Amino acid sequence: MKERIIQPVNSGLNGNITIPGDKSISHRAVMFGAIAEGKTTIKGFLPGADCLSTISCFKEMGVDIVQNGDEVTVVGKGLEGLQEPKAVLDVGNSGTTIRLMSGILANTPFFSCVQGDASIAKRPMKRVTNPLKQMGANIDGREEGTFTPLTIRGGDLKAIEYNSPVASAQVKSAILLAGLRAEGVTAVTEPHISRDHTERMLEAFGVKVTREGKTVKLAGGQKLTATDVQVPGDVSSAAFFLVAGAIIPNSKLVLENVGMNPTRTGIIDVLEKMGATFTVEPINEGASEPAANITIETSSLKGIEIGGDIIPRLIDEIPVIALAATQAEGITVIKDAHELKVKETNRIDTVVAELTKLGARIEATDDGMIIYGKSALKGNTVNSYGDHRIGMMLAIAGCIAEGKTIIEDAEAVGVSYPTFFEELQKLTK
């Protein structure tokens, strides 16, 4: 278990930073390229542990994939060309891989077994396996398909109209991917609109997708045609440096090529509402996945209330938003964020416990947290508990804490941002 020592940053963070490729889009580009007909070239791919797990799984099913840094070539097999894996498909720490891939495996007429690490073994799979079973897939697992390992024998599926109890892009995507070979029109309705990378990329690969309010539909029998994919920077990774730029004194950062998909930009809306000083310069208007350069500098923040429809648009950014709130004047309330409990860790409890160790005044609620600003943080020994977003949040916290901060299990950041600590170091010079 590797640890990192973070010293206070007295001179601020300054400079330009190119944000690594979006994790969600990188996963989908590999998967969709694998089931498309023809060769797909992906540029800007995120070579983090999670996305490499996706490559490994599809290679195991006979797909020819060559990865060289942030460029990947996938020679697609078509929807019917995947081969039965000879070994267990290991997704590592990647919830996206197991949930989306389950939708693809549900419509393949062979047997597969899917598992991941200890964190994946605790994460709820029934939200995906139940609708896939309703479509006709034969899926089993611990506690009737609630937990991994999962066994899947796909086959002839029938379309369903599914009302999802949660706004989850992973649930929605698994059902839509299963629907590609299902008989009829598959429809998914959510309580709030979740991130729409799957819909956008399916359309880029030639699939007709219909969107009506909170409902997404597609007809079975459609084929994917290979296309080249340019992956923008991951706004969830950018969030750590956006908050760092706002709360570390004497800072000014330019974040280049940040993905600006409107289903993901809740962090931008929150920082604006809190009073952060920043500018957004669009760089690829008209692209299926918009991007921008963002300049942010040290700001005076104020506490706000965060809840409702915005939560799915910033669910992964809540740990670092909580950190920002510790440096804001007044009280910040985060609610309607039950989904935090089923991430890599229970992020409500973990954020509260670790920030409390650093001297923050923060308390957990059933569906979020309450943060009392402004708090002077003091260095301490903290732990990511294997959660990449907790690890990065704690690193930024260490930059403003008095004295050194020791982060245990710091290597977890490699899941989504392998060069995070190196980038942080560069910006302090």
From Swiss-Prot:
Domain of life: Bacteria
InterPro entries from the UniProt entry: Enolpyruvate_Tfrase_dom, Enolpyruvate_Tfrase_sf, EPSP_synthase, EPSP_synthase_CS, RNA3'P_cycl/enolpyr_Trfase_a/b
Subcellular location: Cytoplasm
GO biological processes: amino acid biosynthetic process; aromatic amino acid family biosynthetic process; chorismate biosynthetic process
Documented EC number(s): 2.5.1.19
Listed pathway(s): Metabolic intermediate biosynthesis; chorismate biosynthesis; chorismate from D-erythrose 4-phosphate and phosphoenolpyruvate: step 6/7
NCBIfam families reported for this sequence: aroA
Protein name (database record): 3-phosphoshikimate 1-carboxyvinyltransferase
Gene: aroA
